[in-house]
């Protein structure tokens, strides 16, 4: 997996997935949204990806996407401190600026493109 990432550093990947939890974390002048995602589909991934954790900086988002994220965070059924238990492999990605996030207001589906060289940390965790 790591060698594949190194070879395709600049390739952009499209992922479609469903948001199951949003946790806003307020920093000094910014909010970081931590998203827990499931039902991931992508032509680029090999193997089964069950869940994905994404950290997104509010400062790097367009206002319309930020509004959708805030609305979804308020509407969600999970209490913020509830721990989500996952089965299978968990991939954790942290993003800098420059990714392209597209949110669908109706059914909590998120689509985004990112360049692999924007991933600061990749951690595989067995649940």
PLM feature segments, named:
Residues 2-9, 13, 20, 71-75, ...:
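Cysteine-centric segments in proteins
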Residues 5-43:
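Structural detector for short beta-strands of small beta-barrel domains
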Residues 15-19, 83-91:
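OB-fold and OB-like beta-barrel modules that bind single-stranded nucleic acids
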Residues 27, 47, 96-98:
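Short acidic, gly/pro-rich beta-turn/loop elements at beta-sheet edges
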Residues 38-42, 89-127:
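OB-fold/S1-family single-stranded nucleic acid-binding modules
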Residues 41-78:
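Beta-strand/loop nucleic-acid-binding surfaces
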Residues 45-46, 51, 83, 123-127:
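Polybasic, proline/glycine-rich intrinsically disordered low-complexity segments
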Residues 46, 78-87, 101, 108:
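Conserved binding-pocket/active-site segment within a compact domain
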């Amino acid at each position: 997996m790591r060698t594949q990432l190194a070879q395709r550093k600049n390739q952009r990947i499209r992922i479609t997935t469903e948001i199951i939890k949003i946790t806003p974390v307020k920093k000094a002048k910014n909010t970081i949204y931590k998203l827990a995602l499931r039902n991931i589909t992508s032509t680029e991934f090999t193997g089964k990806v069950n869940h994905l954790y994404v950290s997104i900086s509010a400062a790097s988002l367009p206002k319309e996407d930020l509004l959708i994220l805030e609305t979804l965070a308020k509407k969600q059924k999970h209490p913020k401190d509830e721990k989500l238990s996952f089965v299978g492999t968990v991939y954790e990605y942290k993003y800098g600026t420059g990714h392209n996030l597209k949110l669908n207001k109706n059914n909590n589906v998120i689509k985004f493109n990112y360049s692999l060289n924007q991933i600061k940390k990749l951690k595989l965790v067995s649940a």
